[in-house]
Amino acid sequence: MDYKDTLLMPKTDFPMRGNLPNREPEIQGKWEDMDIYSLVQKRTEGRPMFVLHDGPPYANGDIHMGHALNKVLKDFIVRSRSMSGYHAPYVPGWDTHGLPIETALTKNKKVKRKEMTVAEFRKLCEEYAWQQIEGQKAQFKRLGVRGDWENPYVTLKPEFEAQQIKVFGEMAKKGYIYKGKKPVYWSPSSESALAEAEIEYHDKRSPSIYVAFDVKDGKGVLTNGEKIVIWTTTPWTIPANLGIAVHPELEYSVVAAGGARYVMASALIESVAKAIGFEDHEVVQTVKGKDLEHIVAVHPLYGRDSLVMLGEHVTTDAGTGCVHTAPGHGEDDFIIGQKYGLDVLCPVDEKGHMTSEAPGFEGLFYDQANKPITEQLEEKGALLKLDFITHSYPHDWRTKKPTIFRATAQWFASIKDFRDELLEAVKKTKWVPEWGETRLYNMIRDRGDWCISRQRAWGVPIPVFYAENGEPIITDETINHVSELFREHGSNIWFEKEANELLPEGFTHPGSPNGKFTKEQDIMDVWFDSGSSHQAVLEEREDLVRPADLYLEGSDQYRGWFNSSISTAVAVTGKAPYKGVLSHGFALDGEGRKMSKSLGNVVVPAKIMNQFGADILRLWVASVDYQADVRVSDAILKQVAEVYRKIRNTFRFLHGNIADFDPAKDAIAVEDLREVDQYILIKLNSLIEKVKKAYEEYDFAVIYHAVHNFCAIELSSFYMDFAKDVVYIEHADHKDRRSMQTVFYETLLALVKLIAPILPHTADEMWSHFTFVSEKSVQLTDMPETRDIPNAKETEEKFDSFMKLRDDVLKALETARNEKIIGKSSVASLTLYPNEEAKALLSSIKEDVKQLFIVSELAIGGTEADAPEDAQSFETGKIVVAQAEGETCERCRMVSKEIGEDPDHPELCPRCAGIVKTYYQN
């Protein structure tokens, strides 16, 4: 007889190898066929809503690791909420307007922009955006992200644009929208204004100059001919100078040096003297800043007046304490210039070239004008010092080229009238991490008006008409009419029709006696697009609600979407569009460096999915502390793949060992399970509670470690290890075997559900092998519930103590193995000399302790004092390990002196002989 045939070995079709790159697309195909998203929504209908509102990625290019991190985190939350008592719809979105698409067409696609109308160019932009959406959609779906992919929201869709117009109109009605000429961030490389959110800082080398302005009218405080010293790193703005700002409360000195007298802040004399190179100098007069007001100096190049003004923005951090002021090129300059009635002079055009308002420099690119301007200052004797510095300077986030401040006529959203409401809304929102609140609060507190106009083609037009007298027209009637036109035809109609055709029929206005109108040519900042999604998506879609429960984006969105969304929402509704905001860090390479093509360290999601599979990428997301910056590399992914393998192998072992188990008739009631089996269910209860709480708190790394540890420690290295001696060896219906199978079944079912939001492909693959479930997918179930287990606290304490004793036994066996006393642990003979506590513990355990230790012989040999000298000492007592006497049983591989006692089965121990005789002999 072949005794192998009498062993109940595991049987499962669940493969050992994941083969995820090939298997996942098949699983996703099944999800598509069954329309899993709709099935989940139908199942959870009527439950409390949980809405995670998708911040729209920009529709350009392949997805990168930042996208993958973001979408997978969202998917964890939506999936876990729909398994935790909520109705959790997820509508993905795309941001589709703006410069990158224009640039992609004109640069890469060789579109001749100047040879077509605006409307024709915009049609090409729209086509391109849709192509990009399709590409990204396929990549997001490949990640296993579940959502309403057939009905996403897209900012270029007519229904979205129509609602955006309503948001603009409502803000205009409340007086928050105005047109004004003031300095804004201007990108010569994009030929457009930029919002603060579109600025990033990079180091730049700039000239650093000290310039003397001669006093023309000292107002009896200064002497004519004395020189006020300014410092600037933008010589190109000197032609635009109209004034000099000083701080009213600072002390200023007249310093005699080299035959001239110079005016500067007293606190900065030494640093200025050193920078300019005064050999010896002395203070001949001091005066308060406020006494210098209205003094008139002379512009060093043009001889015009330069007025001394008082400004609280002046500091002694650097420079001279006398600040060169060009109202057309700086925010503080503009504000103080308005106060003192100065013109807004801006001698730089949209391409960054000097205009005729800068005589002698017209036509020069502003940066190239620095040198000739400095040379002219030197010729006039006004240049005191030229040097160069490297400093952090604002750049256009798209073109990576420097920006300037440039005064132009722009449309603005003013937040000053509702800033307090905004700050209150920030305080009422739940922020994770908590520092997010401070970050956004300070941004809003310190923020100026928001420049919302852009001088580009691809975007939502600013819905403003102009009367013949130049008066802008924004009324309820015009806004509603334009909104309806956009809903019906899309915003391209604005560029296809004349103003009169876009106005309501019979529209009249006192400013247009001849009935003629023109329309605004600028478009809206793209942040106004996505910032209106709370109205266009949350409010408008029947399956969603405003406010959303959660916005979840990268930490760069405090200045972006989190900011624009709350600004428009509070302006229109008085409330934040979200109850909670969660932010994540950036994806870096394995060494913590930013990914860049030049470094060659870019990790691409598609490559990871082709090599490892989406579930490995998702498990990586679960493993990291995502609220900070996260690292990803081949080596890191290989470590994650090992954890995946452990989880998968656990599934396979548990499933293989319940092949002949029918829960309806074979399950043992929980109170009738052996204590060691109850112990595993108690540990499973703890895991269920821990994992559910972690999903609730978005703490996915806790789940990653908890599930891995449970599989590796409680199951693999303890329970599943000694289980083999029961589930393989005993007869099919043995109570101990059915007891363990009951635990295997409960545990496997719970584990598959617990891990399903993180590893949806693997969980559903395992689910498809279950014969005892009615649902087509694990996604159509809820998180497992904990079981009531009698005397759980006492059982857990008892077996936790036992595990400490077992650790000592394992160490003793390891030492004996190293000393060649034994080979495998299963052939060992153990003699324990336990301390009082361990002795009491051993006598309280009803199970076969020898089986729990997986050894052939076990004896309790009295007290520690009775132990022989060669015994190993541990905290729980002393242990002697020897080779068990006897022969090895052919069937259970344990050593016994009783092998062959049954003459029919001379190779078996009495236990195995009894099983074979009773259950396997005809």
From Swiss-Prot:
Reaction equations catalysed: tRNA(Ile) + L-isoleucine + ATP = L-isoleucyl-tRNA(Ile) + AMP + diphosphate
GO BP, sorted A to Z: isoleucyl-tRNA aminoacylation
Keywords in alphabetical order: Aminoacyl-tRNA synthetase, ATP-binding, Cytoplasm, Ligase, Metal-binding, Nucleotide-binding, Protein biosynthesis, Zinc
InterPro entries according to UniProt: aa-tRNA-synth_I_CS (IPR001412), aa-tRNA-synth_Ia (IPR002300), Anticodon_Ile_BEm (IPR033708), Ile-tRNA-ligase (IPR002301), Ile-tRNA-ligase_type1 (IPR023585), Ile-tRNA_ligase (IPR050081), M/V/L/I-tRNA-synth_anticd-bd (IPR013155), Rossmann-like_a/b/a_fold (IPR014729)
'HIGH' region (motif): residue ranges: 57-67
Subcellular location as annotated: Cytoplasm
Residues binding L-isoleucyl-5'-AMP: 553
GO cellular component: cytosol
Protein name in the entry: Isoleucine--tRNA ligase
Lineage: Bacteria, Bacillati, Bacillota, Bacilli, Bacillales
Gene: ileS
